Amino acid sequence: MLRGAVARRYAQALYEIAQEKNALEAMEQELKGVAEAIEGTRELQKVLYHPQVLPGEKKNLLKALFTDKVSDETLNFLGLVVDKRRENYIAGIAAEFSVLANEARGKVAAEVTTAIEIDEKQKQELVKVASRMAGKEVEPTFGVDPSLIGGVVVRIGSKVIDGSIKTRLATIKSRLMSKTS
């Protein structure tokens, strides 16, 4: 089964629990925090992703780290993920859960990448444009990639709008190369 499909299935299960408990926002933040903690700590990854570390030990570690930081439902969900040996999917599950939560709020996630850091006013303008393009309110994440040279790349779901100078130069190069061949 594809990695995304597994993460989506687990995210859907937790989403349904969150809806029942009326705790969508809280559980989204909890799961995101857990995923960020795992992704940001090499030692934690080594233990959680190691096949010879027993599931009980992994669950005890997660309880020790997150008992005071997440709800019982989120902690139990993490235990289930460990029992099913899907620990390495936690970041993907968190991402898929956010997609479901955004859909419930009538929002869509957008990744906005620019060549240089932009100010708040420019960010707001890009969010307005992206919202019009998506037909929904946009939940943006901003990033910087100097290799773009200039311009902006916006990803909304599977749709990519690439207005970068890097891509324009590559297109011009491709056209020139095809004319000389």
Swiss-Prot record:
Keywords associated with the record: ATP synthesis, Cell membrane, CF(1), Hydrogen ion transport, Ion transport, Membrane, Transport
Membrane topology: Peripheral membrane protein
Pfam families per UniProt: OSCP (PF00213)
Alphabetized SUPFAM superfamilies for the sequence: N-terminal domain of the delta subunit of the F1F0-ATP synthase
Quaternary structure note: F-type ATPases have 2 components, F(1) - the catalytic core - and F(0) - the membrane proton channel. F(1) has five subunits: alpha(3), beta(3), gamma(1), delta(1), epsilon(1). F(0) has three main subunits: a(1), b(2) and c(10-14). The alpha and beta chains form an alternating ring which encloses part of the gamma chain. F(1) is attached to F(0) by a central stalk formed by the gamma and epsilon chains, while a peripheral stalk is formed by the delta and b chains.
Family named by the database record: Belongs to the ATPase delta chain family.
The protein, known as: ATP synthase subunit delta
NCBIfam families found in the cross-reference section: ATP_synt_delta (TIGR01145), PRK05758.2-2 (NF004402), PRK05758.2-4 (NF004403)
GO molecular function, one term: proton-transporting ATP synthase activity, rotational mechanism
GO cellular component labels: plasma membrane; proton-transporting ATP synthase complex
Matches recorded under InterPro entries: ATP_synth_OSCP/delta_N_sf, ATPase_OSCP/dsu
Subcellular location: Cell membrane
Its job: F(1)F(0) ATP synthase produces ATP from ADP in the presence of a proton or sodium gradient. F-type ATPases consist of two structural domains, F(1) containing the extramembraneous catalytic core and F(0) containing the membrane proton channel, linked together by a central stalk and a peripheral stalk. During catalysis, ATP synthesis in the catalytic domain of F(1) is coupled via a rotary mechanism of the central stalk subunits to proton translocation.
Protein source organism: Desulforamulus reducens (strain ATCC BAA-1160 / DSM 100696 / MI-1) (Desulfotomaculum reducens)
